[in-house]
């Protein structure tokens, strides 16, 4: 009992001394900062004491009131401040980290949704632009030595392909190893496809691309393509056509053409008359009808003239052949007409038939028309006029009348 009462007395005296020390200002307080929690000038400061006694503050206060001191209180005479541990909670950081992770996940989901909503064309354009930027950056990153070595190797390869002596060694290209080769392949990937199949010289064999697949169906023996022919006009089935026999068999065709031509001529005249007297609204229709009839009449006229000309030529040639046959019967030697003689004979017969149909005026008109045509051809083929070219004059081509 005596010991307990003595211990209580000593505890009470210590508390009174501590209260007095707190009330009395210390001269060292001026050197402390207002927000400082640690007394830097305390001599007996030990940072590990608070960790050793990590009991609750309420229990400590209760024990102090009871007067039971365990010797863990700092002496207030040695220092003016008391260190207390911070109320740090580790769960707060974990909560903040989880919140930041959730925000990042939400942003990623928003970006993914935006990308999914974009059209494919926009994504393709973006990918192309990124690939161009990457290729340009890689090409710019190459050093000058690498480019020079690649140029030398290309020059040597071209000279070898042409069969010339290699004047530029390509040993420098091996310094850079596979990096230079890869960059060369990337830069020349486009034009290499076209130049690889090009021959080095005209005597070299033709080169084909290996990327082009060869067809499995191959023509080993070339079979002649069958040609379809009409048996009516074939020389195998019909034989040689006899013009005289054909003209005699179809002698009614020229008469039909003449009747058709006369009927079309009357129709054209009636169409012209109707075109003149028709109202303004029907003018385009009447004009189109007249033009159609005129075209048809011209076609029939051409056929009729050609048939008459062919009949006249056959008649003249048959007459000449008959006369030659009679001369042979009389004992003369065989004679064969040449192309020039045949042309003169047909021209003479043409003028004779024209004179029978239209008289001498028709022959004169035909001769004058032929002369003008030949004169125009001669003028076009003449050279420049004398003095028209050079000597500081106008170099424009002139024709002599």
Swiss-Prot record:
| PANTHER family linked to this entry | RIBOSOMAL RNA PROCESSING PROTEIN 36 HOMOLOG
Q: Where in this protein does the record put region Disordered?
A: 1-245, 358-401
Q: Does the keyword Ribonucleoprotein apply?
A: yes
Keyword Cell membrane among UniProt keywords: no
**Highest taxon of source:** Eukaryota
Q: Where is the composition biased (Low complexity)?
A: 109-141
Any GO CC annotation of this UniProt entry? nucleolus
Q: Where is the composition biased (Basic residues)?
A: 367-383
InterPro entries from the entry? Answer: RRP36 (IPR009292)
Coiled-coil annotated spans: 257-313
Gene Ontology biological process terms from the UniProt entry: maturation of SSU-rRNA from tricistronic rRNA transcript (SSU-rRNA, 5.8S rRNA, LSU-rRNA)
Natural source organism: Cryptococcus neoformans var. neoformans serotype D (strain JEC21 / ATCC MYA-565)
Q: Which UniProt keywords apply?
A: Coiled coil, Nucleus, Ribonucleoprotein, Ribosome biogenesis, rRNA processing
Per UniProt, subunit arrangement is: Associates with 90S and pre-40S pre-ribosomal particles.
Q: Where is this chain's protein located in or outside the cell? A: Nucleus, Nucleolus
Q: What protein name applies here?
A: rRNA biogenesis protein RRP36
Task: Give the gene name.
Answer: RRP36
Family stated for the protein in its record: Belongs to the RRP36 family.
Q: Where is the composition biased (Acidic residues)?
A: 27-42, 52-78, 86-106
What does this gene product do? Answer: Component of the 90S pre-ribosome involved in the maturation of rRNAs. Required for early cleavages of the pre-RNAs in the 40S ribosomal subunit maturation pathway.
Feature: compositional bias, Polar residues: 1-10
């Amino acid at each position: 009992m005596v010991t307990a009462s003595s211990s209580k007395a000593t505890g009470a005296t210590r508390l009174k001394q501590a209260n007095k020390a707190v009330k009395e200002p210390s001269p060292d307080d001026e050197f402390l900062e207002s927000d400082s929690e640690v007394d830097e000038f305390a001599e007996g400061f030990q940072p590990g004491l608070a960790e050793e006694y990590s009991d609750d503050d309420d229990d400590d206060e209760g024990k102090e009131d009871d007067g039971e001191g365990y010797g863990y209180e700092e002496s207030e005479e040695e220092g003016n401040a008391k260190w207390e541990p911070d109320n740090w909670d580790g769960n707060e950081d974990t909560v903040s980290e989880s919140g930041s992770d959730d925000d990042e996940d939400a942003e990623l989901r928003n970006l993914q949704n935006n990308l999914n909503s974009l059209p494919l064309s926009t994504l393709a354009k973006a990918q192309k632009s990124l690939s161009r930027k990457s290729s340009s950056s890689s090409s710019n990153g190459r050093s000058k030595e690498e480019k020079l070595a690649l140029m030398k190797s290309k020059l040597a390869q071209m000279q070898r392909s042409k069969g010339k002596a290699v004047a530029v060694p390509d040993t420098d290209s091996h310094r850079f190893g596979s990096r230079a080769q890869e960059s060369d392949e990337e830069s020349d990937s486009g034009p290499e496809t076209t130049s690889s199949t090009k021959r080095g010289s005209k005597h070299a064999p033709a080169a084909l691309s290996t990327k082009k697949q060869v067809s499995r169906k191959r023509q080993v023996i070339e079979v002649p393509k069958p040609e379809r022919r009409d048996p009516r006009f074939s020389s195998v089935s019909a034989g040689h056509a006899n013009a005289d026999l054909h003209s005699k068999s179809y002698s009614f065709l020229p008469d039909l053409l003449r009747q058709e031509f006369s009927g079309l001529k009357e129709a054209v005249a009636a169409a012209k008359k109707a075109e003149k007297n028709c109202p303004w609204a029907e003018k385009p229709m009447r004009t189109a009808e007249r033009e159609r009839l005129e075209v048809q009449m011209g076609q029939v006229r051409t056929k009729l003239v050609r048939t008459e000309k062919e009949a006249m030529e056959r008649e003249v040639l048959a007459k000449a052949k008959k006369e030659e046959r009679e001369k042979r019967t009389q004992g003369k030697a065989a004679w064969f007409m040449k192309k020039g003689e045949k042309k003169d004979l047909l021209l003479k017969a043409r003028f004779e038939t024209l004179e029978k149909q239209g008289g001498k005026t028709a022959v004169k008109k035909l001769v004058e028309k032929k002369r003008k045509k030949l004169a125009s051809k001669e003028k076009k083929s003449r050279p420049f006029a004398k003095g028209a070219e050079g000597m500081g004059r106008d170099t424009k081509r002139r024709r002599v009348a």
